[in-house]
């Protein structure tokens, strides 16, 4: 056997043994009663005033803990925080405006227990409070405002765990972000 083939064979044996070590101790069980997860991601947010057609970058973080078994899944409770920004230039009138949203809230979700190792799918509702700094830039007669508003929505998401503690996560919905992707960490 030549040296290159030996190196490839040793690497393959190492990779297989590493994957068996990562998954040792049974199947990946993403969410169960008593588990804690933390999500952090980036996405597309929207402003909450005006026509709702504007999108901008957003940062979102959330945590959840498994509370109750319900059928093949688990009900979780947790919290979330989102920061989003939107800016628009109305070229016809040469007028700029911008929104900066901070949303803090509680969330509840139902995590369905598929028989696919590492997969977690869920849907839920957030409730909270939002703070919006709105500036009308150079529009004559407007100085902007900073309202506080109630916040509610709906979301659907999925996580896939590569190990017992780390995975990827994505959510869509009418939420503090319309879509986001990030990482998920399972603490317990």
Annotate each language-model stretch with its function.
Residues 110-120, 130-188:
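Gram-negative outer-membrane beta-barrel domains
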Residues 29, 47-54, 70, 91-97, ...:
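Outer-membrane beta-barrel domain signature
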Residues 38-50, 81-83, 125-127, 163-176:
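Transmembrane beta-strand segments that form the barrel wall of outer-membrane beta-barrel proteins
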Residues 1-27:
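Bacterial Sec-dependent N-terminal signal peptides
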Residues 20-68, 180-188:
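Short glycine/proline- and aromatic-enriched beta-strand/turn motifs that initiate or cap beta-hairpins
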Residues 25-35, 51, 68-75, 113-121, ...:
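Short loop/turn motifs that connect adjacent beta-strands in outer-membrane beta-barrel proteins
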Residues 46, 57-136, 187:
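Gram-negative (and chloroplast) outer-membrane scaffold detector with strong preference
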Residues 34-38, 53-59, 98-104, 119, ...:
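Residues that define the transmembrane beta-barrel architecture of outer-membrane proteins
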